[in-house]
Amino acid sequence: MAFRKEELSQTLYENESEQSSETKELMLNNEESLSDWRNYFDEKLTIPGESGALNGTINGYLTLPQPDGCLLVLQHGAGSSAMSFAPVTQELLSNSDNKVGFLALDLRAHGETTLEPESDMSLETLSKDFTHAVSYVQRMFELDEKIILVGHSLGGAICAYCAFQKTIPNTSGLVVIDVVEGTAMEALGFMKTYLSNRPTSFKSIDDAISWHIKTLVTRNRLSACITVPSLLVQQEDGTFVWRTDLYKTSPYWMDWFKGLSDKFLRAPYGRMLIVAGTDRLDKTLTIGQMQGKYQLEILPETGHFVHEDVPAKISSLLLNFWHRNQPLVLPPKVGATPVLQ
């Protein structure tokens, strides 16, 4: 039996240390149903690829905005899935009077997306997939609401690329979560070591969730219960392995992040960067922040998966960002003479 959305909106978003014993018991008794997408989105989409369904489909989850609202397009990072943003969505919905909608997409070679070839993970290809999927949803549902692009890690690089290139109509804002060109490029040298120390399989989903918590990949157990199952696929012997082979993406790592800071700063929309610490900033973004070119938010109590660790804070930042970037409509001047045509 799935959680009611009302229960989720009341209990999902505190840090684990802040959760009551009742909340923890409710969570542990319902871990399997927590990962059901229906708790967080209204629709599941199967979007044909740019060349049609012959080369596979893109998996997405959608909740439509109200006519005077906006659509947040949520793109996860490498090795993650669209469900990475699920802990945020109910808080967004309940605090926006249902005005905000959201579209979360599985990247190529991730989640339930089946696009081929899965080996092509270049930033250009991923950005084309992203643009195609968003444009398809805009046409299919006749959406003309403003769009804010929100991306975590690699997803942030994709969103920055598309914002800089202006590939998605009606975009009004760009939010990048915990990815900066300089620090990302430095971290790439340690990625293969990290991957080699990571388990290749788990006996159960619960073991995988426990590993994510123990290693601080995710610092919120409830979020881990929601997001981790979509990262794994079950083998014939009953064990669970990673859906995405991150080793195979290594030829593209430099390509993903090169020029990211410049693209972010030159995107012609409102910009917000959310990071886990000031040490994440590189020189370009430090100078840009001092010049007031973007909004900077620092959440030091979090790890790399900021939006999973503190979803309530992320949802609050996103809603405030949306309100600040809405077009200003000025009232007519008092006593102004109407112009006759």
From Swiss-Prot:
Sequence segments annotated as region (Disordered): 1-24
UniProt KW keywords: Hydrolase, Serine esterase
Catalysed reactions, as listed in the record: [phosphatase 2A protein]-C-terminal L-leucine methyl ester + H2O = [phosphatase 2A protein]-C-terminal L-leucine + methanol + H(+)
Coiled coil start-end: none
EC number(s) per entry: 3.1.1.89
Domain of life according to the entry: Eukaryota
Residue spans of biased composition, Polar residues class: 9-20
Assigned GO CC terms: cytosol; nucleus
Gene Ontology molecular function: protein C-terminal methylesterase activity
SUPFAM superfamilies reported for this sequence: alpha/beta-Hydrolases
One GO term of the biological process aspect: cellular detoxification
PANTHER family linked: PROTEIN PHOSPHATASE METHYLESTERASE 1, PROTEIN PHOSPHATASE METHYLESTERASE-1 RELATED
Function description: Demethylates proteins that have been reversibly carboxymethylated. Demethylates the phosphatase PP2A catalytic subunit.
Family: Belongs to the AB hydrolase superfamily.
The name this protein goes by in its record: Protein phosphatase methylesterase 1
